[in-house]
């Protein structure tokens, strides 16, 4: 089938490793390996901070998700996951849809994020977006002491799965949006319904905004972008937003509120965890369990922000310590 994939299990201390499958056209297998290892480590922290009985794992399929997807490819991937015997469960991520996961499900039970069946949790993106939205409200309350986003400008980078749902929520809460994405057709569509201003991908760092929401790929907070950002807060859905831990230190010193990525974006994996839980107990998907876990995660974010201010330590260090 021409499948080239890497599955990384970072930790199974808390339970089976769970994490999404990303299909991306990596320049080399070395680049893919570096990405999957970084992402799998991030999942260990994300699952721990959300208090889920799961370890961290991640997988990548090397290829162009727009042109190289076939049902056979995902069945071959499913067979690879199956050989691990439940040590790792796969789910949707960048470039991989609910339909793709359903294809893998034909050959292995070790996939999550399905649409069919009583335990199915579906697309995790809306729940991820809800967590990012609530995190943004927390930041607005802390910095500007307001309960909505009226009068605030948010720059949204990436309006794919999560970014699109997030944009709708931010718009409804009164925020002015400036957005970018490499998918210009989708960008035009989302911008039209949220009255957003559109900018070129690299210009997103230079716009005048109050909050920056990175919702595309990781490491966008790096030496090249740091001095261009004029925002007071960073709250987004992307994984591994800080290129290095030092960037978190610099943001802290500059008085920029950085809401740690794996706390902010934990909604999706909580949703996926509910499906695993239902499957283990023979029960059904439980939306109220998801809501309880999500509110607790937001309490944790509040604790991170409060401790960061009190202890004069960067938020990413506090979050790591809690996880």
Predicted features and spans:
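Rossmann-like adenosine-cofactor binding region
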Residues: 184-260
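General beta-strand structural signal in soluble alpha/beta enzymes
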Residues: 88-92, 112-114, 179-181, 199-200, ...
């Amino acid at each position: 089938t021409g499948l080239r994939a890497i599955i990384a299990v970072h930790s199974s201390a808390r339970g089976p490793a769970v994490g999404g499958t990303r299909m991306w056209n990596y320049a080399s297998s070395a680049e893919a390996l570096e990405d999957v290892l970084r992402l799998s480590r991030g999942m260990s922290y994300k699952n721990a901070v959300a208090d889920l009985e799961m370890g961290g794992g991640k997988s990548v399929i090397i290829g162009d998700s727009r042109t190289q997807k076939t049902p056979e490819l995902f069945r071959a991937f499913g067979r690879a996951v199956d050989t691990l015997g439940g040590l790792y469960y796969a789910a949707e991520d960048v470039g991989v849809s609910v339909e793709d996961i359903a294809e893998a499900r034909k050959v292995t039970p070790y996939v999550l994020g399905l649409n069919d069946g009583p335990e199915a949790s579906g697309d995790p993106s809306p729940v991820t977006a809800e967590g990012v939205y609530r995190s943004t409200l927390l930041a607005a309350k802390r910095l500007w002491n307001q309960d909505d986003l009226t009068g605030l400008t948010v720059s949204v980078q990436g309006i794919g799965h999560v970014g699109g749902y997030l944009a709708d929520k931010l718009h409804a809460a009164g925020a002015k949006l400036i957005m970018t994405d490499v998918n210009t057709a989708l960008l035009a569509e989302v911008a039209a319904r949220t009255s957003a201003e559109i900018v070129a991908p690299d210009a997103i760092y230079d716009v005048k905004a109050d909050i920056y929401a990175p919702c595309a790929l990781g490491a966008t907070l790096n030496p090249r972008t740091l001095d261009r950002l004029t925002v007071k807060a960073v709250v987004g859905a992307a994984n591994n937003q800080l290129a290095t831990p030092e960037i978190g230190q610099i943001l802290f010193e500059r008085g920029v509120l950085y809401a740690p990525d794996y706390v902010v974006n934990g909604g999706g994996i909580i949703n996926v965890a509910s499906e695993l839980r239902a499957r283990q107990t023979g029960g059904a998907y439980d939306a109220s369990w998801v809501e309880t876990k999500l509110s607790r995660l937001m309490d944790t974010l509040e604790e991170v922000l409060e401790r960061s201010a009190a202890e004069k330590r960067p938020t990413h260090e506090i979050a790591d310590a809690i996880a």
